[in-house]
Amino acid sequence: MKNITQLTAAALAICSFLAVTGCDEQKEISSAPDSSNAPAQATTAATTATMNKDDADKIAEIDIGAEKLENGVVKFLSSWDLNPAEGQPVAPALEMFQSQFGGRIEYVNTPWDSRYDKLAVLVQADDSPDMFSAGDMDVFPKGAISGMFDPLDDYVDFSSELWAPMSAVNEQFAFNGSHYVGAVDVEGDCVMFYNKNTIRDNSLDDPAELLAEGNWTWETFWDMMTKFCDVDAEKYATDGWWFESGFSLTTGVPYVGMSDGKIVQNLDNAMIEKAQNFMLNMNKNSLQFPKAQFNWQVQPRRLADGKTLFYPVGLYAMYPYNNYIQDFANNQEDVMFVPMPKCTDADEYYLPARVSGFSLIKGAKNPEGVAAYLNCAMATRDSEAAVEIGKRQAFDEYNWTQEQWDMYCLVNQMTAEHPVIEMYNAVSSNVADLVNNPMKEAYNSGASWTQTRETIRAAVQAELDTANKKLAEKN
């Protein structure tokens, strides 16, 4: 489990600096922060952060034929800044962008919940920023359909050797040969957090050890749940809002995805039905935390109390500033996690995935600068400096254990091998509403999936037909 490749280890370095989106965009709260007092457009002047000399020298050795940009300022519309906070190290991609291309990032601040509203206002006013994060997994196809983003192909050579490692992933964000996302890395989207004390106190097999043995599967997961759960003692197997989708994606089949250049729904797929039946049986056996009895409020603290066995959520929960890991155990070193269990009937170990990447905003004034930054991100993602910076931050700032670091890298390695990207949130709000809650009904309410899909299939297909037509009109 600890034989992690350098390429995979670099994922944490990238995630630490590029994928900060997880801090805001994946919260499990039911309401977003109030943004009514936000200014129409707050910007932070482009600055040049610095890196220590040893790391900077390593970045300088990476040669991609960089030439100084005529316009070095890239305006980044986001709720988070690519420039490091005071006292934090600069990301390898940003260091390369600054030192080799003479580039800088100008942060255009927007509240996360209204980022698309602000984007539309700026595009319509011919005041477009340049770059937008694709880490929320909702840029494509929605952003392409709405005309908020331009293809990157005139500026980024996706067929080049530099971009070869992400070729298959980037094709999932392409239509008729036009790429709307420059994905530079794949990350695990959902993992199973647990308290090692709870595992020990209940004489259960450690999931991390089961994974190392190649035996972390739906079946061993089921055995653990049935041994642990006790309704009278209020002991339940899973909590949170991430389980249903994350578990289903281990089948290798998303509810909505891309196939042969079209947006498709897979509601009738037999593998999805298997996942739904598994979750229905969880409900019938009272294994899942009954959120309905608690006003639909999740209870992450129960993990520390030994009352909940697993808390499935994004890897961003490992960062202390997100205020999750503190609820999982009284001591951080007792927190552990594993990927979602393998679907035994699947031909590979598929895992839910998200990407670190960016898109080119419609009417951007500096597309060349966006391309240069993306090339820097690709060139540095497996660099020695990226690995070392990521490790230092994980151990020195976040107080991770070696075991946690190794598992983080392993999850990202496994996800990169067989990623499954869910797109029902990326087509339209109607599609999201039609799929998101219904696909959770078997798990939460004991509803039959065969009946549920009958009530949504026609409406989902009609929405996808409309989306495909609009997408075709853009090309």
In which residue ranges do the predicted regions lie?
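Extracytoplasmic/periplasmic substrate-recognition and gating elements
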Residues: 326-394
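Hinge/lid segment of periplasmic solute-binding proteins
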Residues: 45-70, 111, 135-190, 219, ...
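Extracytoplasmic/periplasmic solute-binding protein
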Residues: 75, 174-186, 190, 200, ...
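Conserved N-terminal structural module of periplasmic/extracytoplasmic solute-binding proteins
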Residues: 9, 23-141, 381-385, 399-402, ...
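Glycine-centered hinge/linker elements that transmit conformational signals in sensory
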Residues: 223-225, 261-293
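C-terminal capping/gating helix-and-loop segments adjacent to ligand/active sites or protein-protein/ligand interfaces
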Residues: 352, 387, 405-475
